[in-house]
Amino acid sequence: LNVDGRGELLGEFKPNDRLLVINQTGKLKTIIPELTTHFDEDMIVLEKWNPKKPISTIYYDGEKERYFVKRFLVENENKEELFITEHEKSQLEIVSTDWRPVAEIVFTKVKGVQKENQTIDLEQFIAVKGIKAIGNQLTTDKLKQVNLLDSLPFEEPVEKVPEEIEVIGEESISEDIKTELDDDGQITLSLE
C-alpha cells in the first residue's frame, strides 16, 4: 500500500472502510488499510471491501472429488476464514467479487468424446449462503479447466440519504403545542 500513486488504485477510504484480501489457499480476511501492511505471496484479490457484495467461487473438494460452486458474504470481518473445505487436496479454482460473475467449464475428453464447454451464470446457479456452506455441486463430469469470463452487467443500487426534510402545511402536535411554517419554510413551535 502507498499514497504515492504507484500501482493499482484501490479507492478512497474512510476510517471504517476495510480491504478484502483473498489468498489462493481459499482463505479470506478484511483488514483496515495501513501503509505498513504486507501481503502474502499467494494473494489473488485485494480490493476495497463492500459488505453487501457476495463473493463467488468454484473450488475442488478433495474429499468428495467434485467441483462445487458457492456464493457468500463475509460474516466475520475481524477473523481470517477458510471458505473451501479443509481437505489437503481441496483447491480454489476461481474466485470473483463481481456482482454477476460468469464461468466457463471445459470438460475432459472421455473415450475420445469431447463434451461441449458450458457457460455458468453463478448468480443463477446458486443463491448467497453462509461462508461455511459447501455449496452446490457444479458437475459430476471430470473437468479439464475452469475459466472466469466477463461478468454480466450490474448497477449497484445507490442509497439515497435525504439531506433535508421538508414539512408542508400546519399540523397540531398536541393541544399545547402549535406548529407553523415561517417565511423561509422552517417549522416554528409555540406553546399555548
Description of each model-found segment:
Residues L1-E192:
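C-terminal interaction appendages of subunits in large macromolecular complexes
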